[in-house]
Amino acid sequence: MAAAAAAAAAAGAAGGRGSGPGRRRHLVPGAGGEAGEGAPGGAGDYGNGLESEELEPEELLLEPEPEPEPEEEPPRPRAPPGAPGPGPGSGAPGSQEEEEEPGLVEGDPGDGAIEDPELEAIKARVREMEEEAEKLKELQNEVEKQMNMSPPPGNAGPVIMSIEEKMEADARSIYVGNVDYGATAEELEAHFHGCGSVNRVTILCDKFSGHPKGFAYIEFSDKESVRTSLALDESLFRGRQIKVIPKRTNRPGISTTDRGFPRARYRARTTNYNSSRSRFYSGFNSRPRGRVYRGRARATSWYSPY
């Protein structure tokens, strides 16, 4: 009995302690609906006291609750390269620094504000130069077209004549042989001036050396002048006795070696005279035309002095 009383007293003392946050109080409904606290001699109180004493170490072990670990923030999706960045109020770590860095470059009044106008000025100058180059090309093309369409007077190209026209011109022309190498077209025109109106004087020259060959052709305005000029055959011109005969029309396949020399390669200095007796010198404007048959002693060619 003494042991039971001591246990009840211990249970009452334990029940009389201050109720801490880590202690439990077991209520067992009694006859009056509630069990009395620390009532000595009660069986229910005794059982509760033993249970409290037995559970007290477990409660002390479970009393410190571990702090909840902070939840890891899920990785934020990266924005595509062209998408705008987060705003100033997003609160994302590092966003403010990323926004501040370009802000420093944009707000820098040193280089950025000076380079933009200079760059624009350079681009404008390049555009102007390109436009000027295009205009120059257009002008050059127009000038070339005009030159091709209308050659300048006094330097007209060789006129292509039909066979009938060539025969008619040859009928009004004479051949002058043994002409002095230093003679000019003006001197020949003056020598035959009394025979009639002279349209053209052609002095043939060597193709390679450019030296005169010693004969010429003179074209008159009419056939009557040709007959008159034959009277100057074997006359003296610059100390030489010249030979004057009517010019013959040469055709392909007809030999022209009766005058003692091949006539396949030559240059011609031609001077034209119009009806008002004014004259101009066209230079070496004739091209040799002919066929040379190799392996034979004679050459056959078609010769056109005009």
UniProtKB/Swiss-Prot annotation:
Q: Which InterPro entries match?
A: Nucleotide-bd_a/b_plait_sf, RBD_domain_sf, RRM_dom
The record's tissue-specificity note reads: Ubiquitous.
Residues the record lists as Asymmetric dimethylarginine modifications:
238, 259, 263, 265, 267, 269, 277, 279, 287, 289, 291, 294, 296, 298
User: What ranges does the record list as Pro residues composition bias?
Assistant: 77-87
Q: PROSITE patterns annotated for this entry? A: RRM (PS50102)
Q: Which residues form a coiled coil?
A: 115-151
Post-translational modification Omega-N-methylarginine, affected residues:
17, 238, 259, 263
Give residue numbers for the modification (Phosphoserine): 19, 52, 95, 150, 235
Quaternary structure note: May interact with SETX. Monomer and homooligomer. Binds RNA as a monomer and oligomerizes when bound to poly(A). Interacts with PAPOLA, but only in presence of oligo(A) RNA. Interacts with transportin. Identified in a IGF2BP1-dependent mRNP granule complex containing untranslated mRNAs. Association in a ternary complex with CPSF4 and influenza A virus NS1 blocks pre-mRNAs processing, thereby preventing nuclear export of host cell mRNAs. Associates in a single complex with SKIP and MYOD1 and interacts with SKIP in differentiated myocytes. Interacts with NUDT21/CPSF5.
Domain notes for this protein: The RRM domain is essential for specific adenine bases recognition in the poly(A) tail but not sufficient for poly(A) binding.
| Additional note from the record | The association of the expanded polyalanine mutations together with the capability to oligomerize may induce intranuclear inclusions and cell death. Expanded polyalanine mutations may either result from unequal crossing over during germ cell homologous recombination or from DNA slippage. The pathogenic mechanisms mediated by polyalanine expansion mutations may be either a general disruption of cellular RNA metabolism due to the trapping by the inclusions of PABPN1, mRNAs and/or nuclear proteins, resulting in the induction of cell death; or may change the normal muscle cell differentiation.
The name of this protein is Polyadenylate-binding protein 2
Q: Which organism is it from?
A: Homo sapiens
Tell me the classification of the organism that encodes this protein: Eukaryota, Metazoa, Chordata, Craniata, Vertebrata
